[in-house]
């Protein structure tokens, strides 16, 4: 593209690029010019057709998605009705099961109460028997401890109050008594 120099103010002809290069220019002017060139290239390459086709394809896709959504909504409504019907049937069945379970629970409760009473009676009897055994054992232990304590006390008394000669006499007397008992 040629530009007359008179328009540019020089008096000779220049190309547009020469004229632009000679401009001491404003950067915003060059940015605007670059933008125009960029858009011109895009139009030349047919980008607008590609964009239009993409938008048309997108619109068709959205239309298809809306149709699919409508179909899915109808299917969902049918499924909801089916599930509500099944839920009502399940609730009726559950009520019947609950009634049967209550009846069985009552009989199991009575049986468990009877078993518990029997177990409690057996455990009470066993506990009473153990207590009686423990009492007998305790009485025997007390008697043994008392006898041992009495023997120790007697030994201490004898040691402190009797002389050695008296002790020998007692031992001799006990030996005679043991001898007589053995015969």
Swiss-Prot record:
GO terms for cellular component: plasma membrane; proton-transporting ATP synthase complex. The chain crosses the membrane at residues 27-47. It is a single-pass membrane protein. Keywords: ATP synthesis, Cell inner membrane, Cell membrane, CF(0), Hydrogen ion transport, Ion transport, Membrane, Transmembrane, Transmembrane helix, Transport. InterPro entries: ATP_synth_b/b'su_bac/chlpt (IPR002146), ATP_synthase_B_chain (IPR050059). F(1)F(0) ATP synthase produces ATP from ADP in the presence of a proton or sodium gradient. F-type ATPases consist of two structural domains, F(1) containing the extramembraneous catalytic core and F(0) containing the membrane proton channel, linked together by a central stalk and a peripheral stalk. During catalysis, ATP synthesis in the catalytic domain of F(1) is coupled via a rotary mechanism of the central stalk subunits to proton translocation. Component of the F(0) channel, it forms part of the peripheral stalk, linking F(1) to F(0). F-type ATPases have 2 components, F(1) - the catalytic core - and F(0) - the membrane proton channel. F(1) has five subunits: alpha(3), beta(3), gamma(1), delta(1), epsilon(1). F(0) has three main subunits: a(1), b(2) and c(10-14). The alpha and beta chains form an alternating ring which encloses part of the gamma chain. F(1) is attached to F(0) by a central stalk formed by the gamma and epsilon chains, while a peripheral stalk is formed by the delta and b chains. This is ATP synthase subunit b 2. The gene is atpF2.
